[in-house]
Amino acid sequence: MPMYLRQLMEAYIRQKRASPGMVQASDLQINRPMSGMRSNSRELHAYDGPMQFMSSPQNPDQILTHNSSATSHISGNNLISVGGAGSRNNSNNLRTLSTISQEADLIEEISSHELEDEESSPVPMQEQQKPLPLSANSTRPRTRQQSFSDTLDEDDYANRNIAAAAPVRPAGMAASPYKEANLEGSNGTANGGESEGDVIGNIDQFVMQPAPQGVLYKCRITRDRKGMDRGLFPIYYLHLERDYGKKIFLLGGRKRKKSKTSNYIVSCDPTDLSRQADGFCGKLRSNVFGTSFTVFDNGNKDSTESPRLDLAVIIYDTNILGFKGPRNMTVILPGMTEDDQRVKISSADPKQQGILDLWKLKNMDNIVELHNKTPVWNDETQSYVLNFHGRVTQASVKNFQLVHDSDPEYIVMQFGRTSEDVFTMDYRYPLCAMQAFAIALSSFDGKIACE
């Protein structure tokens, strides 16, 4: 680059630095020893080192006498000079309009051709760059993620917390539409019009009553591993969560001894978990392989006045090849009437078919079919994930969300682990506490053909 072009470019850069649009650090001090002490009166320049000689008045190659600390403003025929902190003689800053105009045109022409080079261009001060995060393949330890390595069970998978939903009544519940105007919200919580449920009336009646529309019941299940027979049959307790850590007992369940298949007794009396107890609410029974579970109420299958009713059927997909991954489950419920009550279906009644038989025959008029929401594979955590919105904190193969195919964003029920023996269980319409608790109990039971 010719010498005069380089000098003009330096003058252009000095003028640009002194303009109001640029902010220049005037109080930046470099910590270096200077005769054993720091001088607060040391004059600071734009260039420090060999480049400082370029801005010196004694520079033999200096052509322009323009002071870099002054900025000229042209307003009509008047010339206004604004002196900077390093200006000593403002009279040297005044020049004719023609000279400034010619220099500006020449500088603009030079800058348009991008004639800067590394020697003449000022080197700006740069902040120290932060190290980039290591890639997923690096060995740098990450913060704890919900993945298979963090599981408590060897076949657990990761998850997240409750996807939001504007409820839509699924097929089989189309008798009355949802009050969508009162249930709109981005997270399905009370902020969007949905309220948290509370116990109304007696416990034994409440646990059998379907959840009202627009109400979310947040519950917690605790597992007592001591249970019965030295821990062979744990006891499970369901509580409704209240504010400030309070809770209300709803149901208790345990596995029956001396039963050919898995058989759970559910009662609203925590002190007496037996079929003969006054608080007996129903039972959960599985097939031999543990792939199908049926939920019954407390009725008598041999009674004609109060026959035993089917409350739900839970079917787990078989996994004969033993592939690891989340479970796939199907839940069939009785349909809902116009007044939001369950359709009475009894497999004990020889005059009608049970829920499982209706589902096998594809007779969906009086039943509702739900499925677990398919988790999404996360490449970063190398795990399957679901959005539980803070309600689930640990990975487990037992974590699931139940949805209807017509509206996958309406979470009918969700269940997941928060600690080794504590789980959260949230449910909505059309489930009742008995149905939701029985579905959760089925996830605890061992499944020969599903693991």
Swiss-Prot record:
Lineage: Eukaryota, Metazoa, Ecdysozoa, Arthropoda, Hexapoda
Signal peptide (UniProt feature, chain positions): none
Pfam families hit by this protein: Tub
Residue ranges of the region described as Disordered: 113-152
GO cellular component terms, A-Z: ciliary membrane; cytoplasm; nucleus; rhabdomere
Name of this protein: Protein king tubby
Keyword Cytoplasm: yes
Statement: the UniProt record of this protein carries the keyword Ion transport: no
Sequence ranges of Polar residues compositional bias: 135-150
Key words, A-Z: Cell membrane, Cell projection, Cytoplasm, Membrane, Nucleus, Phosphoprotein
Compartments, as annotated in UniProt: Cytoplasm; Nucleus; Cell projection, Cilium membrane; Cell projection, Rhabdomere
Similarity comment text for this entry: Belongs to the TUB family.
InterPro entries reported in the protein's UniProt record: Tubby-like_C, Tubby_C, Tubby_C_CS
Superkingdom, taxonomy of origin: Eukaryota
GO biological process: protein localization to cilium
Entry-annotated residues carrying Phosphoserine: S147
Location (main, coarse): cytoplasm
Membrane topology: Peripheral membrane protein
